[in-house]
Amino acid sequence: MDPAELLKKYQPQDFKVLTADPQVTAARFSPCGKVLVGGGYDARVRRWNFAIGDLPELPALEGHHGWVEGLAFRAEGELLFTADSWGQICCWSGYTGDQPTIKWKVDNAHDGWIRALSLSPDGKAIASCASDRFVRLWTTEDGVKQFEFPQTPQQNLSVLFAPDGTFFTGDDRGLVRHWNVNGTLIRQFDASSLYMLSRLQDVGGAFVLALDKSGTTLAVGGTKPQGGGTVTGVPSILLFDVATGAEKQKLELGTVNDCYVADIHFHDEGFLSVVTFGTPGAGQLLYIRPEDKTPFLTEKKMANCHSLAWHPDGKRLAIAATNGGSNGNGRPVDKDGKYVANHSPIHVFTLPS
């Protein structure tokens, strides 16, 4: 389908803005589409009811100790998996209900910030990666550790299961590894163009991973770094052939102030939807076909986007972003002298299709 036809079908239309205060790191739809879940900076797991037209908020889930960044669902048994910056993983049962319960938790699943979770295709295992440089597999039914992979030289930022049961990890130097669940390394993908050392600062890395529906093309998102400190860089995606490890395409998606690709989704119609974050106030929603050099949709009205989630019905889209005039350095205070915290507007769109 050509870009004009795709845009006609998938042009986002404003529906509602939900507010998460303080911010959420990401927001994801449950497989049934009844609930949108966000991982909070305040250690809460926020939920919104998408089975009701005005999208009311459901009671938050409490039990974490730090930022909740890892989110994954298993439809069977309505299990929600969450992970935080203190190294804890929780499994919640009944995520669409008013009071989900903790089925199990592992307080010290990792020694440090858990950056991502991914569910195996058969629903029996959950993979986690963290700042301690370990990747671990856990049994979804009881949280027992199935396997621990050898500690990698650098911390891993991303983890993603493939349809065939193998999985990928991406580290902060831009090296992506393809693993069997028995610990065998299948191959490596060189995404080091998404990394630079700026004095003592590591900038970039394999920030986000995505696969097309067939599992044959791997997208690695991050930035083409230009400088450290207040990071500048061009949001970039590298597309690799999974079978060979060869880089097929590089997509550069903005200016040096747009910085990072935050999230990627391969649509069944063959295009990628992407959100980015950059210098305070810079955020983009982009649609681009892998074979093209320029997006056929560029929307810049949202600031510093964190995540992008397509509803299972294909007719709605939710993007977690940052409030305008966000406080990035801690200086602004209110009339009482208190720190002004940021919040997350979650933009909900409907789609013509």
Give the residues covered by each predicted segment.
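WD40-repeat beta-propeller superdomains and closely related acidic/aromatic-rich repeat-like regions
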Residues: 1-353
